[in-house]
Amino acid sequence: MHVVVFGAGSLGSLVGGLLGRTHEITLVGRGEHVRAVRADGLRLTGAVDLTVYPEARTEPPASANLVVVTVKAFDTPAAADALAAMDEAGVVLSLQNGMGNEETLAAALPSPVLAGTTDFGAERTGPGVVRCNGVGEVVLGPPEGGESPAADRAGGAFREAGIDATVAADMPRRLWTKLAVNAGINPVTALARVDNGAVLEEPLAGIARGAARETAAAATAAGVDLGPEEAVAAMEGVARETADNVSSMRQDVEAGRPTEVDAINGYVVERAEEPVPVNRTLAALVGGWEAGEAGPGRD
């Protein structure tokens, strides 16, 4: 199967590298990382020790059987435009943080669009090198819920490459649960410059729990059954499992890059039908940092 990974950052490179054990892979990205992969291959270290040699380019090819989108949420519109120029994209799977990505892709593409989540931990440690901080699974399915042959095909592609993959019929609930996890962990660790496990202890635990509970309330308002303590338990479970990891938003802040806070905490603020002061404050603080410090480069 020909798989295009659109967004050769840390997660996209890790997923592409793992899929490359079985499938033909094209990584689409930019900058020094793509040049290094093109010249010397992609090296995975940490929990996975592997070198693969995918095609690396700055624009998508004409066709693919599966496209995995891993760009930052703010780059989804540009990704959708680029993928729309393909003759055939096959099945499109969003493995992105935040909410609203699938809708943006579906509006621009004729291909079936799937939603996905993953708990793989990835960190780019140098051009052409990505460290796997934790082996996880991929869960995917139609973003509106239910079953689809496209989801079955995509799930099979991951399993063929030795990746634990589940095809799920309850993606709306899973996406909101992931949003609660990200809303609690990402901005708190980014602002405090701490590893994920720090949100399990005060003074940060109360803030992270508050963000997760507010996200559950917004989910309920959207018609998704997610209880506040379920959201907290999910957030704390991920924080415990990834206690020594650096969150993606903290990586962005420390690198001076824009973050995905608008698609995470900002999304909760937009969708909530009651006050969400914790998410509003976190979104404002990270947004204020971006306005003053984040550089223009979004790669």
Please report, for each region that a protein language model flagged, where it lies by residue.
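Short, well-ordered alpha-helices that flank and scaffold nucleotide-derived cofactor binding pockets
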Residues: 17-21, 81-85, 107, 266, ...
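NAD(P)+-binding Rossmann beta1-loop-alpha1 motif at the extreme N-terminus of oxidoreductases
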Residues: 1-53
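NAD(P)-dependent Rossmann-like dehydrogenase/reductase catalytic/cofactor-binding core
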Residues: 209-299
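Hydrophobic anchor at the start of a short beta-strand
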Residues: 3, 24-25, 90-92, 113, ...
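Internal alpha-helical scaffold of NAD(P)-dependent oxidoreductase catalytic cores
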Residues: 86, 104-111, 131-178, 190-230
